């Protein structure tokens, strides 16, 4: 009985070790494959200040910020930034 328990424990340890080795080799090869550019075009996670040049109207504020009003004479929307100061 004790011999069978030690064999199953040793098999479990070897199995987990081989599984971890296989997963690490697979992860390393996928990382190298991605760095070489064989994968799809990955997103750019680096924040670049030059990317916000093309944003014309960028208003930073909470969702309840009032940024304009509806003119009753024209019936259209007018931003506060377009009004007279």
Swiss-Prot record:
Keywords per UniProt: Membrane, Transmembrane, Transmembrane helix
Residue intervals passing through the bilayer: 7-27
Topological relation to the membrane, as annotated: Single-pass membrane protein
Subcellular location, record wording: Membrane
Any one annotated GO CC term: membrane
Major localization class: membrane
Keyword field contains Transmembrane helix: yes
Name assigned to this protein: Small integral membrane protein 35
Organism listed in the record: Homo sapiens
């Amino acid at each position: 009985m004790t011999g069978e328990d030690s064999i199953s424990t040793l098999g479990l340890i070897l199995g987990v070790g081989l599984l971890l080795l296989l997963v690490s080799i697979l992860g390393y090869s996928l990382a190298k494959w991605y760095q070489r550019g064989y994968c799809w075009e990955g997103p750019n996670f680096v924040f670049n200040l030059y990317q916000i040049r093309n944003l014309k109207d960028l208003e930073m504020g909470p969702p309840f910020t009032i940024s304009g009003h509806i003119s009753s004479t024209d019936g259209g929307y007018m931003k506060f930034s377009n009004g007279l100061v």
